[in-house]
């Protein structure tokens, strides 16, 4: 039997937190290891439970979602972190992605869609709401940072941007999964970003 994906919920709104928990627990693929109301508690619980996915609210009292995200990464928590919030402010999106978020969904996401996106993010895919993608397309740069990539690195990035996992990219490009990881490390370094989500953002920006 396949192990369930461990999910940690961090949201200071009790009703929202309870609703998301009940939704996630309807799917046998998931186990909610904890649901907490503050970022400080969330960091502590994450270190104790080693979740696969953390669903994090942005606008929380006390430690903000951004500071919680930074704290989780600073403590070495390698869970996939999905921001689930009502905010679609551009600055919030850019800042959170740069800080190491693996996905960004709005709270008006359909329940079935949310469950599917949690599965995808756990598999290493990039998750962004369609409205978020549209916002990213509006951002402009004078220089194209993608020009520094080799053809192969660009091919890998193009696959990342479609939401494929490393294993799927390897199959698509007929290369090993380890080679995919090497290309990803190189392209992240060249683009001066720290996550595949941030690299995807650049891809969308330059391919309007």
From Swiss-Prot:
Q: What does this protein do?
A: Could activate the expression of a formate dehydrogenase operon and could repress the transcription of the fumarate reductase (frdABCD) operon.
Q: Name one GO biological process term.
A: phosphorelay signal transduction system
Q: Where is the Response regulatory domain?
A: 6-122
Gene that encodes it:
narP
Q: Name one Pfam family in it.
A: Response_reg
Span of domain HTH luxR-type: 142-207
Q: Which UniProt keywords apply?
A: Activator, ATP-binding, DNA-binding, Nucleotide-binding, Phosphoprotein, Repressor, Transcription, Transcription regulation, Two-component regulatory system
Give residues where 4-aspartylphosphate occurs: 57
Q: Which SUPFAM superfamilies match?
A: C-terminal effector domain of the bipartite response regulators, CheY-like
DNA-binding segment(s)? 166-185
Q: Which PROSITE patterns match?
A: HTH_LUXR_1, HTH_LUXR_2, RESPONSE_REGULATORY
- Its protein name is Nitrate/nitrite response regulator protein homolog
Q: Which GO terms describe its molecular function?
A: ATP binding; DNA binding
